[in-house]
UniProtKB/Swiss-Prot annotation:
<dbReference type="Pfam" id="PF12291">
    <property type="entry name" value="DUF3623"/>
</dbReference>
<protein>
    <recommendedName>
        <fullName>Uncharacterized 30.4 kDa protein in puhA 5'region</fullName>
    </recommendedName>
</protein>
<dbReference type="InterPro" id="IPR017496">
    <property type="entry name" value="Photo_alph_chp2"/>
</dbReference>
Length: 274
C-alpha cells in the first residue's frame, strides 16, 4: 500500500477502531465484574507478545510491508498496555480519591501513585522496543511507540494541570478515582508547549516523508505524520467544544447510570468521582 492518502485513511481507521475496541471490552468487563477485567488483560497477552515478535522480525525489513508491520506491532503493544491500565490491573498503588483541597505537591504525588506501575511498564516497553530494533534498518516501530508514549505523557500532565474539557464517561469502575486528580482550568502553561511540540513533530515527520529515498521510508514517515497529527487533535479535544466522545459512545454497551459526557468546568472545584 504505497498511496499516502490510503495510508493516512487506514491509520485514522486503526486509531479509531483500536480505541473503540479497547473501550468496548472495558465496558463489557465493567458490566461483568472485576474478574472480567483480569480475563481481558490475560486474554490480550497475544497482542503484547505478538507485537514484540512482529517488531523484532520487521527490524531488518525496510520495505513498505516492513513499515506497516512495525507500525502495527507498536500499536499492538501499546494497545495491551492501555487495556491493562484501563482494566485497573497495571495502574498504580494509589486507588484513593484526591482530597478537594490538596496542595499541588500532594496532588502530584497522589497522581503519580495512581499511574506508577503503568508508567514503569511503558518505559520498560519503550526500552525493549529500542533493544529489538536498534541494530536494524527499520526503526518505525520504536518511533511509533515513542510518539504514543510522549503524547500520552503530555496529555496526562495537561489533565493534571487543568484543561477546560475533561471526558470522564470512559473511565471504568477500577479507575473511577482518577477523575478526582483532574483539574478544570481555562488554560495551563504546558498546553501551548504541547501543541507547539506536536505541531513541530508533525511537520518534521512530513518533511522526512517528502525527502524519503525509498517507498518504505516514505510510508513509514507518512504513518508517523498521521499518528502525530491525531495526537495533536486529541490535545485540541481537551480545549475545543467538540463532541469527540460520540466517535465511540455509539458502539459501547449502555450502563444504568452513565457518567456525564463532559464534566463542565466549575471555578475553584476539583471534580471528584466519575
Amino acid at each position: 500500500m504505497n498511496n499516502p492518502w490510503l495510508v493516512a485513511l487506514t491509520t485514522i481507521f486503526v486509531w479509531w477502531f483500536s480505541t473503540g475496541a479497547i473501550l468496548w471490552r472495558i465496558r463489557r468487563a465493567d458490566l461483568s465484574g472485576r474478574a472480567a477485567h483480569m480475563r481481558s488483560v490475560v486474554g490480550g497477552l497475544p497482542l503484547l507478545i505478538g507485537g514484540y515478535i512482529a517488531m523484532a522480525n520487521s527490524a531488518d525489513d525496510s520495505s513498505v510491508r516492513g513499515a506497516h508491520v512495525a507500525f502495527l506491532s507498536a500499536v499492538s503493544v501499546w494497545g495491551w498496555f492501555e487495556l491493562a491500565f484501563l482494566s485497573g490491573v497495571v495502574a498504580g498503588p494509589n486507588r484513593d480519591h484526591c482530597p478537594p483541597f490538596a496542595s499541588m505537591t500532594e496532588r502530584f504525588l497522589r497522581s503519580v501513585g495512581t499511574l506508577l506501575w503503568h508508567e514503569i511498564g511503558l518505559i520498560s516497553a519503550l526500552i525493549l522496543c529500542a533493544v529489538l530494533v536498534w541494530t536494524g534498518e527499520n526503526h518505525f516501530g520504536l518511533w511509533t511507540f515513542a510518539t504514543l508514549f510522549f503524547a500520552r505523557v503530555s496529555a496526562k500532565l495537561n489533565l493534571f494541570l487543568g484543561v477546560p474539557r475533561i471526558n470522564t464517561q470512559f473511565l471504568p469502575k477500577p479507575l473511577a478515582h482518577l477523575a478526582s486528580h483532574f483539574r478544570h482550568a481555562r488554560m495551563n502553561f504546558l498546553f501551548p508547549v504541547s501543541i507547539t511540540v506536536l505541531t513541530f513533530a508533525t511537520g518534521c515527520w512530513m518533511e522526512r516523508a517528502a525527502d524519503a529515498q525509498t517507498d518504505g521510508i516514505f510510508i513509514g514517515f507518512v504513518l508517523l505524520t498521521v499518528l502525530t497529527a491525531l495526537a495533536l487533535l486529541e490535545h485540541w479535544f481537551m480545549v475545543l467544544p467538540l463532541p469527540d466522545q460520540k466517535l465511540w459512545t455509539w458502539m459501547l454497551p449502555s450502563v444504568e447510570d452513565p457518567a456525564e459526557t463532559v464534566a463542565e468546568p466549575v471555578p475553584g472545584r476539583i471534580p471528584v468521582g466519575e
